[in-house]
Amino acid sequence: MKELIEFIAQSLTSNPEAVKVTESDEGDQIVIRLEVAPEDKGKVIGRQGRVAQAMRVLLRVAAVKDGTRAVLEIV
């Protein structure tokens, strides 16, 4: 799941080497934290959060396939 978010974020940003994705297990869910360069944050979030929401949906689908729950945080 971490690789999926990393691939999508690197494809969206103009500075792909600044993309940092960390994964941590917090109780019954997996938390994926996505860090991007400040100038790329708008591209990753998208208008009215549409891109971020689409990434969260894809992450949720991947998590269900693995039988877990996942949350995406963009910082």
Where are these regions (language model features)?
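RNA-contacting regions in translation and RNA-metabolism proteins
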Residues: M1-K43, A52-V75
